[in-house]
Amino acid sequence: QLYRLTNTDITDVENEMRALEDAIKEYELILSNDDELKKVVKDELRKVKKEFAHPRKTEIKDEITEIKIDMTDMIPKEDVIVVVTSEGYVKRVSKKSYSALNGEETALKDGDYVIGLFEQNTLDTLLLFTNKGNYLYVPVHTLPELKWKDLGKHVSNLVPIKEDEKVIKALAVSKFDDREIITFTSNGMTKKSLLKDFVVQRYSKPIMFIRLKDNDEVVDVLMEPYNEVFIATKKGYGLWYDKSEIPTIGLKTAGVKAINLKDDNVASACIFDGTFEYVTVITHKGLAKRIKLSEFEKTTRAKRGLLLLREVKSNPQEILKAYVSDAKKMIMLVSDNDTKEIKLTEIPIMDRYSTGSTITKKKLDNVYEVSHLTKDDVTNKKEVTKSVTKEEAKEKKEVSLKEIDDKFMTIDDFLDNFS
């Protein structure tokens, strides 16, 4: 029995050795012969297909060829406070943070002041107009989110502008529609444009909204629901006419003559409610007065107008600003980085030929209306509208499922091409 067991073990070992030798020969053949290697790969893949085969769960149809992704869906919807300053600094602050400040003033550089304070949504748009006839299209969600006491970031960090280019006006827009934007320039030109024409898809650089001559600059950009126009010149002339006198034309045009100038420049312009009674005039030497609007005759565009104050050759004055506005308005006087806030009702009423009353002994650098928080600077004064979806802010990416599917190969395709 022991002999038989030993003989059996020897036979098993010999059989195993022969099997190993055959396997070694087969492996060497596979490694040395590309055709044999490809044959083995095909056999293995067929086994995989047979073992794991199952019907496809997705279906590709010709009429369903793309997916459209609305990039605005990626923007968190949030109500924020937007601040714009005369020096071009911008920021957005969370509404919750702003509400907790109890009326504290925002941080500003010396001599800087706020020209726009708005309550907006991150899906809204901020339009910034410059003295060089360009506008910056800034989606609110791209503004830097900062604290109320932070200075903000200069707008050139968002859109590159020239060194001598300055932001003169900010408008908050939640809906681009048929409302009118009216532009006035230093050389006495004006034009009317439709808000809907300001929508752009690419906003990485300034966009022209009025064609200027070399020595001209934009004085003001206005969006008001009223119909009365009043323009004042630096040398003291004022002209009153109806807004319908100004034609509606394209963005890249120069406009028409707003007022007839003789060695003069436009100081300011306003669009006002016909029920307002007084024209407020402020000069660079700190003199001011209010004139009854009834002292002026409403006329037509492109005339010289009437004198707003008596000319004194020994003490010449230049008009800084002229307002026809609500008597309850507050204005800020800027001189040597100092500011002084006064009510229009504090300014005395005089006739057109008087020189005015002293409201400050300092020479004024600027005068501006005090900004109050508004939801949409260009909505009707009696109604605030808000749009949640904005077609102009959408960026769509298209992906063809059919093209992607055609790039994939089945195992059978692979085996047929495998050579």
Question: Model-predicted segments: where are they?
Answer:
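Short, structured "edge-of-domain" segments at secondary-structure transitions
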Residues: Q1-S419
